[in-house]
Design a protein with these regions (language model features):
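Signature aromatic-anchored transmembrane alpha helix within multi-pass, membrane-resident enzymes
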Residues: 9-14, 201, 362, 368-395, ...
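Interfacial juxtamembrane loops and adjacent helix segments
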Residues: 42-92, 104-109, 113
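Specific aromatic-rich, kink-prone transmembrane helix
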Residues: 102, 130, 153, 168-187, ...
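Transmembrane-helix motifs of polytopic, lipid-linked glycan transferases
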Residues: 115-138, 176, 312-317
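Hydrophobic/aromatic-rich transmembrane helices and adjacent perimembrane loops
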Residues: 170, 215, 328-333, 344-375
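Perimembrane helix-loop-helix junctions
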Residues: 180-194, 215-250
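Membrane-interface alpha helices of multi-pass inner-membrane proteins
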Residues: 193-211, 247
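Membrane-embedded, lumen/periplasm-facing catalytic core of multi-pass transferases
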Residues: 388-453
């Protein structure tokens, strides 16, 4: 019987993974952060493809150069120094990028949409396995199918497996840390060498994956210390638990010393605690949370009703539960994390609250379990979970697919012998269009907020000697102003719009023009 249960769970996990993989195959374009992930995991010099020369002027990049930039060359395999320095230059720790580095070896070091997917899908599967262990530890084994379905097939989870950043791996380490803490609690706070070692590995790798891990770990750690005092645990146990975490923190910092600068002085650290418009940002995150679990974000009353029901169920679970600390440990750190994430992030995006999704799933399923008293309540809960996720699967779609970008790639293939001029207003978003730049003969990247870069483009002899070229301009920029400057200051008098980019932030918003004389 035990063997058949394992087979059924394996089939369920495989089915969930197949659904996610089917969406991954539909992914066409990339977020600029995804482009940076690919480059910084394999490039020895810098993850950001610099678009200017030593004088600050735009420089031509051949398609071979761009391709090499996101390709892991044989001489850079296992170049851990470069991985370390790339992330020291950026504002993230290096473990996730190291995993992507290894994953790229499966594809000969080439740039593909599956390099990061391998890392994310493995982290996802491992998180499911840990959730299974959590429910077994709580003697709620019959709730495993419902929880795996509700969490694994939610739009939020699918989106984060597809999104080629570190948030799925972060979520795995948060869930693993929770599970190990739960085991310590269930074992009357006893700590042996194996427990301390495993908890240490999880804590350090979680921190070296994404600094936000520390927020979750801190909340769980504080609750455990409080509970130890409430239960009048042995003072030696409390001291060992506390000192172990101090050592974990010191080791994490020593392994990646640049984290001090990142956390204290970067735009991703504690300086973000000064961000304003808190309640507006809070509501944006609530909408992301609602989207994650199949709730239509266009209907505010529906979101509010769903939240009232959700927290009502949690309160009921707390009242009915004989182990109230487990209810607190499952829910309160997520609430704390959510509140801090709202304050700490410059952009309100689903990725930053991804670690809350497995705990919201656990809380929802366990709350329903406390509510129902029917004999076959587990089957009913599984049906409810399945209905909710199917609503999402049929009425919504995962984020970060960028399917409209296919048209840009088709235009690039049709004009591969032409030069490509990419116009935007910053120093980073060009990483989103790397797939196009790998097709066109050569690319000139122009920042309208740069050092007279637009004027440099207009006077560039190499460009002006062309009979025609493809021009890409971000659709939020004043396109007409740039087009008029081209007509007025160059021999290129014929400009035809061949593609109008979508305005959604989850698509590649570039307008394409055929510019000719």
């Amino acid at each position: 019987m035990e063997k058949s249960k394992k087979i059924i769970l394996a089939i369920l996990i495989a089915t969930i993974c197949c659904v996610i993989f089917s969406f991954q195959t539909q992914k066409v374009g990339f977020h600029e952060d995804e482009g940076y992930t690919a480059a910084s995991s394999v490039n020895p010099s810098n993850g950001l493809m610099v678009a200017t020369d030593e004088n600050g002027n735009p420089k031509w990049l051949t398609k071979e150069y761009v391709t090499d930039f996101v390709t892991l060359s044989p001489k850079n395999i296992f170049n851990f120094k470069a991985l370390y320095l790339n992330q020291a230059y950026d504002n993230h720790p290096p473990f996730f990028y190291t995993m992507v580095h290894f994953a790229s070896l499966f594809f000969g070091g080439h740039f593909t949409k599956y390099n990061v997917f391998i890392v994310n899908i493995v982290a996802f599967i491992l998180s499911l396995i840990v959730i299974i262990k959590i429910l077994k530890l709580l003697n709620k084994e019959k709730l495993i199918p419902a929880t795996l379905i509700f969490y694994g097939l939610s739009m939020g989870t699918i989106s984060m497996v597809i999104f080629q950043r570190m948030y799925m791996l972060l979520t795995f380490f948060v869930v693993l840390y929770f599970y190990q803490t739960l085991k310590i609690y269930k074992n009357n706070f006893k700590l042996d060498g194996k427990t301390i070692t495993l908890l240490g590995i999880t804590t350090i790798l979680g921190f070296l994956t994404q600094y936000f891990f520390a927020i979750y770990a801190f909340a769980i750690f504080v609750l455990m210390i409080i509970q130890m005092f409430r239960r009048k645990a042995n003072k030696e146990l409390i001291k060992n638990y506390f000192l172990a975490h101090v050592i974990y923190a010191i080791l994490g910092i020593l392994i990646f010393v640049p984290c001090i600068k990142h956390l204290l002085f970067s735009d991703r650290g504690i300086s973000n605690l000064g961000n304003g418009e808190y309640f507006l940002h809070f509501w944006e995150y609530i909408k992301h949370f609602a989207y994650a679990f199949s709730i239509n974000t266009n209907y505010t009353p529906l979101i509010i009703i769903a939240l009232v029901i959700f927290f009502g169920l949690i309160i009921y679970w707390f009242i009915k539960s004989k182990e109230k600390f487990i209810v607190v440990l499952t829910t309160l750190p997520s609430i704390f994390y959510f509140i801090i994430a709202v304050k700490m992030t410059s952009f309100q995006e689903l990725r930053y609250i991804m670690p809350t999704l497995p705990f919201a799933s656990l809380a929802f399923i366990l709350s329903l379990d406390s509510l129902f008293t029917l004999k076959n309540k587990e089957n009913i809960i599984t049906i409810i979970a399945t209905i909710i996720v199917f609503i999402g699967l049929f009425t919504s779609k995962p984020l970060f697919l960028y399917k409209d970008y296919q048209k840009c790639l088709e235009i690039a293939k049709q004009n591969s012998e032409k030069s490509f001029v990419y116009v935007y207003d910053n120093f980073f978003n060009h990483m989103q269009s790397i797939p196009e730049m790998m097709i066109y003969k050569k690319t000139l990247i122009v920042n309208t907020n740069g050092n007279n870069e637009l004027e440099f483009m207009l006077k560039n002899d190499e460009l002006n000697n062309e009979s025609s070229y493809i021009l890409s301009i971000k659709n939020y920029i004043d396109n007409d102003e740039i087009l008029n400057k081209i007509k007025e200051n160059t021999d290129f008098k014929n400009i035809e719009k061949i593609y109008e980019g979508p305005t959604s932030k989850y698509e590649v918003g570039n307008n394409l023009y055929l510019v000719s004389k």
